[in-house]
Amino acid sequence: MDIKDPIHGYIKLNDDEKELLDSPQVQRLRRIRQLGLSSQVYPGATHTRFQHSLGVMYLAGRFADSLNLDEDKKQEIRTAGLLHDTGHGPFSHASENVAEKRDIDHEDISCNVVDQLSGKINSDTDRIKKIIKGELEIGQTVAGDIDADRID
């Protein structure tokens, strides 16, 4: 399956990624603004976490290609890129203080989503969670100082 992205062109998804994309946990990202409340001031600031997550998945895959990683690691990185923001609440970072009061962050919640979707993920879910948290060296492609998340 291909998805047309205004920035990255056609993004290819394999069957596993399509199944994750169709999950309620990922589909809800269509209703969460990437820039939080900025769209209230800047009408053009309307892109969503869904669009962003597709871009991060794509860029993470490009990083994996550049690093000559094997297909298993590439799939782990792409999956982490797709799911890395599923833990965001309404209005994105503007609502993070609610989670912080419970001593959790959106990455923790995203890791819980990985657990919820584990039956649809044909990769090592523990490694995917570590990539989301930036705990593995290859996690720097998704959760580092210069990463697919910040580039998108």
Where are the regions that the model predicts?
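Sequence-structural signature of the catalytic-core scaffold of metal-dependent phosphohydrolases
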Residues: M1-I32, Q40-R78, G87-D152
